[in-house]
Amino acid sequence: MFKVRVIPCLDVKDGRVVKGVNFVDLRDAGDPVEAAIAYDAAGADELCFLDITATHENRGIMLDVVRRTAEACFMPVTVGGGVRTVDDIKTLLRSGADKVSINSAAVARREFVKEAAEKFGDQCIVVAIDAKRVPGRDRWEIFTHGGRKGTGIDAIEFAQEVVSLGAGEILLTSMDRDGTRSGFDLPLTRAIADSIQVPVIASGGVGNLDHLVDGIRDGHATAVLAASIFHFGEYTIRQAKDHMVRCGLPMRLDP
């Protein structure tokens, strides 16, 4: 059976880790490289590094931070933000990223996912989906550009399409739950996880350790991502994993 992954997320703006509520009201949470080193030592299964304003501000990835983060960490690192071309992916992989997350560019041009997967392999291509529930309906709309731009695109249909084009993993964030500490959007997570055949990382809304368990058990995700509960010292990675083991989930535990 697969091992459940616990993934801290470093949302970075202007070279600092930040944490917001519903993608706004950003709060400083420290230096990204220092945070990465701490999470690596704490036993995180992976690290997700997202330059959250790169696409919106039309600028490139902070490659120096990416390089220093990758050099400091032994765990796999996924990097995203402002990834628009095959050359962007190549540069990130050469800088030390293990996987690259594509968001707005995948929505704008689906074939980009296919090109990337064919060139680098689907194992390192992650498509990030930021979704928001359509009021009064059991449907979710995709937003792009750091959650600033609605698209009218159905999140479930989009997930199925990008997987058919070669996406090896989906990083799914509920904009409604992001930063609220009220738990994952389980109907959204479950709907997408049950509709595709690749791993789904649940993101957005973790406020306690039971929420992590819920994402796997009820959301059918294969990995869970969290930020604020780890960044501000409320829980450690080991506490999270120990709790999940007690709840019967298969985890990788360091000695």
Curated annotation (Swiss-Prot):
Entry annotation: catalytic residues: 11, 130
Entries under Gene3D superfamilies matching the protein: Aldolase class I
Location of this chain's protein in the cell? Cytoplasm
For the keyword Plastid, the answer is no
The record's InterPro entries line, in alphabetical order, gives: Aldolase_TIM, His_biosynth, HisF, IGPS_HisA/HisF, RibuloseP-bd_barrel
**Main localization (coarse):** cytoplasm
Q: GO CC terms for this protein? A: cytoplasm
EC number per UniProt: 4.3.2.10
BP-aspect Gene Ontology terms: L-histidine biosynthetic process
User: What reactions does this protein catalyze?
Assistant: 5-[(5-phospho-1-deoxy-D-ribulos-1-ylimino)methylamino]-1-(5-phospho-beta-D-ribosyl)imidazole-4-carboxamide + L-glutamine = D-erythro-1-(imidazol-4-yl)glycerol 3-phosphate + 5-amino-1-(5-phospho-beta-D-ribosyl)imidazole-4-carboxamide + L-glutamate + H(+)
Q: Its biological function? A: IGPS catalyzes the conversion of PRFAR and glutamine to IGP, AICAR and glutamate. The HisF subunit catalyzes the cyclization activity that produces IGP and AICAR from PRFAR using the ammonia provided by the HisH subunit.
- Which proteins does it associate with, and in what oligomeric form? Heterodimer of HisH and HisF.
Give the family from UniProt: Belongs to the HisA/HisF family.
Name the UniProt record assigns to this protein: Imidazole glycerol phosphate synthase subunit HisF
